[in-house]
Amino acid sequence: VTATIVFDFDGTLAIGHGPVMAYAECAAPLAGAQYLERVETALAEYDAGGGGYRDGYDVVGSLAAADGVEAAALSDAYARSRDVLGTPEAPVSAVEGIDEILESLGRHARLVLATNAPAAGVYRVLDSWGVRERFDAVHFAVGKPAGLTPIIRLALEDGPVLAIGDIFEFDLAPAVALGADTALVGATASTSPESVTMRGQTIAELRPDIEAWAASAASSTPAPEGASPRLER
């Protein structure tokens, strides 16, 4: 049995609004008056559990679209912001103790990074954290939610799977549909009505639960088909 933990990147491993504000800066020349101020206000509301936005990138895109910015222009703004990911123009913060956490989990589970983001800048960030080699596989431009399904399905052939992310619809719903376990982190963790295996503000907060899951999963025997007992913590 080989357990697998599938991590999202933005909002899960990479936290803070630096990359989001870099995206907003690139979109601002095309948007309306006081756009950046409106983005900052909406981000604060999102962080407090309100606003109804999917994540920070949704805040930036939605407000720009409401100002008449076309999808193609927003896509270009996003791409330009990712080119500077991990630089002073788009600073990224890591989950506290990320290297130790990944090192610990890697003793018991295969670690996979699966993100909708393009590769641009991500390896630079992982290298700056010293964790690039902690991952057994890395998938970019996955096309979640649908694109996550084959990754989860393949991992389940080897053993238990835990998907970790900050957007239930994209990062966790495909895992739930296949019977895998899930961990919801980020601003929506405390308010989301979705049923998940565990939830917390950050991976660091959930570290004991995730480590316990990994140790248990690594020593487990395959469950009978259709059996998926799960308790939310």
Model-assigned labels for residue ranges:
Residues 1-41:
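Active-site neighborhood of HAD-like aspartate-dependent phosphohydrolases
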Residues 41-87, 99, 103:
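A metal-dependent, Asp-based hydrolase signature
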Residues 1-2, 99, 103, 112, ...:
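Asp-based, Mg2+/Mn2+-dependent phosphohydrolase catalytic module
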Residues 40-51, 60, 148-155, 162-165:
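Structured N-terminal alpha/beta-domain signature
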Residues 20-28, 57-61, 119, 123:
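An amphipathic alpha-helix signature
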